[in-house]
Amino acid sequence: MDFMTIEEVAAKWGITPRQVRSYCANNRIAGAALEQGEWRIPANAAKPERKRRRTFPTTILGILEAERSSRISGGLYHRLQIDITYNSNHIEGSRLTHEQIRWIFETKTLGEIGADVPVDDIVETANHFRAVDKVIITASSALTEAYIKRLHEILKSGTSDSRKDWFAVGEYKRLDNVVGEMETCPAKDVHREMAKLLAWWKSADKTFENLLDLHVRFEQIHPFQDGNGRVGRLILLKECLKYNITPFVIAENFKQFYYLGLQDWRHGRRARLMDTCRTGQDVFILGLRQFGHAKLAEKAEAVQKTSERQGTRIYTLSMV
């Protein structure tokens, strides 16, 4: 068998002698032998493939998807699932505590839950976890009527509502409804109004302010018999992830500001809702830092400061 020196192999492979020595020392060249202080390498030895550097997600969506698929516990995905499920359901009247929801998510069991907690609260909690996964997995998909109906179907499957003849799970409402004193879109007009809304969003600039406008208009249509608020907030999460807008969770203790902000928006006063959601963005950025994503947090903060300085309301970010 013919052998080559370190220098000859380096010239043949187009790399440095130091790299060849490293390959030899780490047993990455078959047949290489050290004799009297010199490496002898078979002339027909194959060049080792370079180890690929580990790549890290550069967007929030990438982080969430990586942690979800690898089932990492105690990270950003873990925190988001628990926080958004607790707050979004609590806004709608769920009696489960944050700790109880954490327990259900982490153990897939009920633990010690009082008899006064409605079964629907438990079912809708599990369903909400699935809906958040759906949003993360399909965030890049187009926002369509079929997609929105699927979110509603996931949320309401197996609930007491799903067994009512007049309640349409995964379909638009059959009966007219109201929200407080606000009239919503008549059932017969929902498809038309939703089509118009989604057509507008498709062509609109994907800014923070326009995203909130989408949310307000969706809630005013109120396309489903129940579950509109939770579906609407899931849409917010999806589109934030898709368009690299800093996500936010509407905290339950900001419920009053959130509802007042929705009302104000319809009358041309946008500050309250925007400030409420910006607060949620600030909390999310703190979470990025807490879980080791400082560079992404810095990028988000820089974009926000630039937007405020320029007098705009565009809150987008990307590491790319």
Q: What function would you assign to each model-found segment?
A:
Residues 1-13, 17-22, 26-28, 34-320:
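FIC/Doc superfamily catalytic core
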